[in-house]
């Protein structure tokens, strides 16, 4: 039994790291195009891919919506300032995975290189406790099915914000 637990732990860590390494980039989301060959993605792409890979290996996975604040990340004020009509509080996609009969929060959003910019990066994950989350600030978690979006984000601002954020994160 202990050998099987170790094998599962190694597998979940390996899959987490595989998806975590994919560079973060805000871009169009099409669930049908998510596969192991994506070369970049945001929380939607990366959580969807990790969910698919984990379920393929027999893990129980739940989709989670997390409300976070972009202000809690190390993003230049000039980029945050683009959001004039839109709030900085946005919904985020993440996962819960059942590991050893316990639901564990697993967030693979930020690729390791973003640690240099002050983003919360999970390193050497133990495969059994919560990973670091999207920010170290205040977060609210919802089961995907229970989440009702009440946040009004203006599309033009969001697109400009995403464009500038992508430039900053890839620099």
For each predicted feature, which ranges?
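Solvent-exposed, well-ordered amphipathic alpha-helical segments
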Residues: 1, 7-14, 58-59, 99-100, ...
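Alpha-helical and coiled-coil interaction segments, frequently adjacent to or embedded
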Residues: 134-171
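Generic alpha-helical secondary structure signal
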Residues: 28, 123, 129, 145-146, ...
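Secondary-structure boundary elements
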Residues: 1-42, 46-51, 105, 168-169
């Amino acid at each position: 039994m202990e050998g099987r637990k170790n094998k599962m732990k190694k597998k979940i860590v390996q899959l987490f790291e595989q998806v975590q390494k994919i560079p973060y980039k805000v871009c169009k989301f099409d669930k049908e195009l998510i596969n192991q060959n994506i070369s970049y993605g945001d929380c939607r792409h990366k959580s969807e891919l990790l969910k698919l890979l984990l379920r393929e290996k027999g893990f129980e996975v739940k989709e989670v919506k997390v409300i976070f604040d972009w202000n809690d990340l190390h993003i230049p004020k000039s980029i945050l300032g683009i959001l004039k009509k839109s709030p900085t509080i946005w919904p985020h996609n993440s996962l819960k995975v059942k590991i050893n009969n316990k639901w564990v929060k697993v967030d693979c959003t930020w690729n390791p290189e973003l640690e240099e910019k002050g983003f919360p990066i999970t390193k050497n994950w133990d495969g059994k406790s919560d990973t670091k989350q999207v920010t170290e600030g205040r977060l609210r978690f919802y089961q995907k099915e229970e989440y009702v979006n009440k946040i009004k984000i203006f599309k033009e601002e969001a697109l400009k914000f995403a464009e500038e954020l992508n430039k900053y994160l890839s620099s």
